[in-house]
């Protein structure tokens, strides 16, 4: 579309005297939805049935709901946006398709590919680098572990870190981005904490995480990225346990 242009004439006191029409505006094209209604309904039914089953089994009592976005990775076309909102006070569930772009959640391990990307971009790791997956702790704090090496250690490549969903590989990448590779009883230097979080978030944004997706719909959330964070927050962010993103952002990330 094209905006109308008008020229406003003011008197010496700043009061409007007249308005002159310079050019008329024109209506823009209607939004061409790529959502197929039958497919959309199918996705919604899958979510509803699966979530109701989890509620019945007692596994989703405190869940805020379930959301899904289907996207064509070749074109970025959104094929379905479906959601079921669960009211924790009343226990009622309701359809909430727009929640896929307005509600934010901690994403978990799906961000690990972006963490590796940040490690490569910032020369913290190179190629299919081998690191030791091991319990990581600082000054007697609870250890950060991976499910497969909770009580031991194992040398793994970057590819295997994704395959096995290694938490501690990602933490070590984050530490190397700070210029402080992990070692037992290591001394912590927080001077590079803020710059390193900025680098990590910058890479995440390249995948669409923490930034606008560009979808032409109102009230889209760009995620929740707290301004204040701790060293522990930075480390856990490397495996998806701090910043919050929308389902739509995660779909864009997966399609990138």
Language-model regions, residue ranges each:
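Beta-lactam-recognizing serine transpeptidase/beta-lactamase-like catalytic domain environment
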Residues: 8-26, 35, 60-105, 117-256
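Short alpha-helical catalytic segment bearing the HExxH-like zincin motif
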Residues: 109
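Short, conserved phosphate/pyrophosphate- and ester-handling motifs at nucleotide-, phospho-/glycolipid
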Residues: 112
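Active-site phosphate-binding and catalytic loops of NTP-dependent enzymes
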Residues: 52-61
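N-terminal leader/targeting segments and the immediately adjacent pre-domain N-terminus
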Residues: 3, 8, 17-53
């Amino acid at each position: 579309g094209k905006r109308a242009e008008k020229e406003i004439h003011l008197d010496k006191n700043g009061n409007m005297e007249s308005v002159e029409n310079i050019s008329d505006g024109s209506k823009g094209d209607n939004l061409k939805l790529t959502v197929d209604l039958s497919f959309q309904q199918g996705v919604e039914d899958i979510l509803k049935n699966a979530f109701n089953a989890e509620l019945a089994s007692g596994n989703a009592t405190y869940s805020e709901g379930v959301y899904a976005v289907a996207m064509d990775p070749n074109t970025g076309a959104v094929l379905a946006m479906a959601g079921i909102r669960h009211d924790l006070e009343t226990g009622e569930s309701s359809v909430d398709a727009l929640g896929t772009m307005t509600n934010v959640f901690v994403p978990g391990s799906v961000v690990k590919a972006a963490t590796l990307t940040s490690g490569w971009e910032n020369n913290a790791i190179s190629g299919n680098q081998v690191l030791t997956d091991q319990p990581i702790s600082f000054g007697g704090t609870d250890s950060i572990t991976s499910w497969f090496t909770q009580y031991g250690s194992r040398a793994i490549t970057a590819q295997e870190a994704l395959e096995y969903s290694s938490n501690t590989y990602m933490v070590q990448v984050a530490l190397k981005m700070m210029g402080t590779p992990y070692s037992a009883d290591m001394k912590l230097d927080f001077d590079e904490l803020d710059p390193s979080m900025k680098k990590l978030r910058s890479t995440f944004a390249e995948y669409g995480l923490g930034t606008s997706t560009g979808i032409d719909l109102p009230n889209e959330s760009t995620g929740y990225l707290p301004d204040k964070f701790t060293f522990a927050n930075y480390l856990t962010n490397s495996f998806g346990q701090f910043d919050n993103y929308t389902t739509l952002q995660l779909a864009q990330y997966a399609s990138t």
